Amino acid sequence: MSGDVAAENSIHIQNGGSCEVVQSNGVTTNGHGHHHHHHSSSSSSSKHKSSSKDKHRDREREHKSSNSSSSSKEHKSSSRDKDRHKSSSSSSKHRDKDKERDGSSNSHRSGSSSSHKDKDGSSSSKHKSSSGHHKRSSKDKERRDKDKDRGSSSSSRHKSSSSSRDKERSSSSHKSSSSSSSSKSKHSSSRHSSSSSSKDHPSYDGVFVKPEPVSQQLMHSGSVDAFQMQQLGSYEAAAAGTNFNGNGNVAGANYKNGYEESIVDIKKEEESFNNLSQASSCDYSMSQFRADEPPFVVKHEQSYAEEDSTMNYNDHDDDADEMNDDEEDVPLAMRKRKQEATDRPDGGMDNDDDDDIPLLARKKVKKEKIKKESKEKSKKRVKEEPSDDYGNVKPKKKKMKKEPEPAVSPGKRQKAKAKVEEEEVWRWWEEEKRADGVKWSTLEHKGPVFAPRYERVPRNVRFYYDGKPLELSEETEEAATFYAKMLNHDYCTKEVFNNNFFKDFRKSMTPREREIIKDFRKCNFQEMFNYFQAESEKRKAASKEEKLIKKNENEALMKEFGFCMIDGHKEKIGNFRLEPPGLFRGRGEHPKMGMIKRRIQASDVSINCGKDSKVPSPPPGSRWKEVRHDNTVTWLASWIENVQGQVKYIMLNPSSKLKGEKDHIKYETARRLDKVIDKIRATYRDEWKSKEMRVRQRAVALYFIDKLALRAGNEKDEDQADTVGCCSLRVEHVQLHKELNGKENVVVFDFPGKDSIRYYNEVEVEKRVFKNLELFMEHKKEGDDLFDRLNTQVLNEHLKELMEGLTAKVFRTYNASKTLQSQLDLLTDPSATVPEKLLAYNRANRAVAILCNHQRSVPKSHEKSMENLKEKIKAKREAIEKCESEYHSRDEKKGKQLERLRDQLKKLELQETDRDENKTIALGTSKLNYLDPRISVAWCKKHDVPIEKIFNKTQRTKFLWAVHMADENYRF
């Protein structure tokens, strides 16, 4: 490495103490301009950085003055570790390069436009001697350091006279914090930049020099050569007449606002790009560079950490005072980072390693980090007390990698906040249960949200009767739109639906309209249908901004009306919106389908809230039907709907305490049944032989409820759908076969179950049950009840005698959960993959769904989704074949790829099997209503299956109590 310096600068001292540094590249720096900028916004972070670097460079500059050799290259750097262990002559050579780099650094600090204006006026002093140049550049550097150590927010930081700044200083005045000492301080140690490790402080003539927390590599404290170099540097500094400002800091160091953003531009510094070692031993502050020059930024910025050392130094009393002032300038965030930087395994990167790092790799510092540190500079600085145990041991400094703090976007903050709110769960299951029937002590809510008023369709959207447009009244038009919106639905093809609608449609008409509109077949709703279809498409094609506005409106409504306060806890409401007017559909083949559901008014609604709570306000100009304070019920509002005359409720969300408690009690009751089920089964078997027909019918019905998980079945009125349960079975629903398909005593059930879903099952029963059924069906014709001496009320009273809280639904819940538990034990292979375990779980779930007759029609999208899945499987198989053909000539990497492809194919094939098996089975119904969720939670925990694979978000929220309660050893 050459120690020559080619850059020649001249310094013009102004009367006010300002100076201009003119370099060969023509860039001029005005000291006062930068000084003022630093005064307004500099941070302790940049102060510390610049000071430590200046001291490192100026330590070597003293040898530059004694050696006449100079180089023509800027930004040269040498290995500092090599400097520390070489002879003093060779180390001075390397120091010369650091000095040269420092001179170049000064030139780069000139980023203001005024520096370019003074370019021509100062170019005449370019060709001075090399030693003179370094002397003056050091003088300029001292001024900047002096300015730096004055406070960033107080004007008193600049009250040193210009004469003290203009004093002649030697180029060796700046020592590194690890090697500098003055004639008065013989062994001043290098103080750590972190407040926790500040034990020995360098002092010059009794004055403390502030270091900075940057990744400068320090001299090994145990090295004798390094110590000799320190003392030699101290004596040379004293001989050169080194001066320091009154604040105890090297004068000079003009910086801009902390770390300024600089755009990396490699082409503008080709010399630095060619010499990768230039940035290795010198970490520049971002403010040292012009905005148009590429900064030398180390990839992993580092800070010091305290370590043991074997070299002892003596402290001066004034060091402790300077430490106190110094810590005041350190931002709290910076001190925190210093304290945390303790665990880097490699102990920092030495200079040789630094030299090996490509320049591009060292320039990857995020702009976000720079901006963040700039913001920290504007914060109020917190004074930190100095450590009382300042020892006389110089700690060895270890570089630590500083992880950049990730910038959090507003969206992520909102998600994080929402996550925190979700984690703040009301653990009601850990509270003591109340046995007095009281559901809550305090309840407050805002009431329901009413459906919006009807907005008439545009005048060009018309209703046609008998081919002619007909203008309708507002009420009649609204009724017509109800039907128009469903025009493409299957309901509109049903005669019952159309007849019921037209009957109510005529009720909404004016007398004149009623005279004209008499035949439903002449009504034409097509134009209205087209309008609503176009509106639907328009909503789907809305811009992101429009959708966001709508979303925000819904969220605001949810925030206001979607929550209530119950016993001091915020709970979500399930259906806070009242049902809008429309056409009644009903479940299954309901006889009232198509009837018009009228608009609900405030006068129809009863409110339930706490006595001491604020009663919800009704819409202006109206009043509630009733305000109640009943804490034995869980509903918040109720009304009677006009179609069936049933009471409708606004209830809490399934994830609420009241709903969760109800579920918990249901499953605990089913678990209690497990303890007495054998006794109950023995009882109804004995009753098959009873002399009373009533007892026999009850015993056979209970057998079917237990074995087939049938619903009890209530009697239906004529205006209700004809669905059948166990007690309401009729003769036509049951067929008896002495032998069928190789089975004996077979009973064939075929009847419409809940939601008019067909229940068909061929069951082999015990011989005594078969004979009893033959007895029950004697002398009965089609339409007669099979169990003519039994109803649900009688059955439930008997069940309560067998066990407290026992109902037909408890039997259904018990058998469903018991089936799931046994099927999981049977089908789950602990060594299987997660997809295979999921297939086993779905098969167990499907067994329950079949038991409970949870069927569904094949989804319309099933065929298309299966085709897509088969295409994926085909493509995956082709990829495997191609990979196998290349495998023999490939390395191990190809083998891993082949294994991965096979796993993916297996996963797709399992998915295809699972989807096809479940096309007519509704797994969700049993999962939500009949299966103890703790069984699934325990299975997931035991077999390392993510709970998200079993329960979706809604189900996880509903069963949060189960997730917290159950461990892997839970058994139903």
UniProtKB/Swiss-Prot annotation:
Modification sites for Phosphoserine = S303
**GO BP annotations listed:** chromosome condensation; chromosome segregation; DNA replication; DNA topological change; instar larval development; oogenesis; regulation of embryonic development
Q: Where does this protein have compositionally biased stretches of type Low complexity? A: 104-114, 173-183
Give the residues annotated as active site: Y930
Bias kind Acidic residues: ranges: 316-330
User: What are the protein's UniProt keywords?
Assistant: Cytoplasm, DNA-binding, Isomerase, Nucleus, Phosphoprotein, Topoisomerase
Q: Where do Polar residues bias regions lie?
A: 11-31
- Span list, region Disordered: 1-210, 300-416
Residues flagged as site, Interaction with DNA: R539, R587, W635, K666, T723, K754, N796, H854, K872
Record's keyword annotation contains Cytoplasm? yes
Stretches of Basic and acidic residues bias are at: 51-65, 72-86, 93-103, 139-151
| Family, similarity comment | Belongs to the type IB topoisomerase family.
Describe the task this protein carries out.
Answer: Releases the supercoiling and torsional tension of DNA introduced during the DNA replication and transcription by transiently cleaving and rejoining one strand of the DNA duplex. Introduces a single-strand break via transesterification at a target site in duplex DNA. The scissile phosphodiester is attacked by the catalytic tyrosine of the enzyme, resulting in the formation of a DNA-(3'-phosphotyrosyl)-enzyme intermediate and the expulsion of a 5'-OH DNA strand. The free DNA strand then undergoes passage around the unbroken strand thus removing DNA supercoils.
Question: How does this protein assemble?
Answer: Interacts with Topors.
The UniProt entry, under PANTHER family, shows: DNA TOPOISOMERASE 1 (PTHR10290:SF3), DNA TOPOISOMERASE I (PTHR10290)
* Name of this chain's protein: DNA topoisomerase 1
Protein's organism: Drosophila melanogaster
